[in-house]
Regions:
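Short, Lys/Arg-enriched segments at the junction into DNA-binding effector domains
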Residues: 4-7, 121-137
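The feature encodes the CheY-like receiver
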Residues: 18, 60, 78, 90, ...
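Charged docking surfaces used in two-component/phosphorelay signaling
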Residues: 19-27
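Short hydrophobic/Thr-rich beta-strand motif most characteristic of the beta2 strand and flanking loop
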Residues: 29-38, 44
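His-Asp phosphorelay/catalytic-motif detector in bacterial-type signaling
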Residues: 49-51, 75-81
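Active-site residues of response regulator receiver
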Residues: 56, 86
Length: 137
């Protein structure tokens, strides 16, 4: 029996990037929903359960950093794995994103294979470890 596809939410207002990222992740076996605004993303997060969030920082209705603060302050989304995808690529931008609670940070433009590798690593790190998996016990 096949495990259900892991669900990802992509919040980004760039329709071309959203289509490219969505296609690449779907081809890798993930279920991908997208939202073009923070308000749409917030509504999806309240209505659905996701395994990870991919978030642009510069959106028409707000700042992704403020959105991240709110996510990390909410018990329901506090531990949701978060990958920031943004044109803000300076070292201080990455540091601020990570300090606010992002689990990873990928500046645009990026290679689709790198995005896929980072999503896999993000989900692997977030996976619960069972006693059977703990070989050091």
């Amino acid at each position: 029996m096949t495990a259900p596809a892991q669900r990802l939410l992509l919040i980004d207002d760039d329709a071309r990037l959203t289509a490219m990222v969505g296609d690449n992740l779907r081809n890798a076996g993930y279920q991908v929903d997208s939202a073009p605004t923070l308000a749409d993303g917030r509504a999806r997060l309240q209505a659905e359960s996701y395994d990870a969030l991919l978030l642009d920082l510069m959106l028409p209705d707000g700042d992704g950093l403020d959105f991240t603060r709110a996510l990390r302050g909410d018990a329901r989304t506090r531990r949701l794995p978060l990958l920031m995808l943004t044109a803000r690529g300076e070292p201080m931008d990455r540091i601020v994103g990570l300090e606010l609670g992002a689990d990873d940070y990928l500046p645009k433009p990026f290679e689709p294979r790198e995005l896929l590798a980072r999503v896999k690593a993000l989900l692997r790190r977030a996976a619960p470890v069972s006693a059977a998996d703990d070989v050091l016990a």
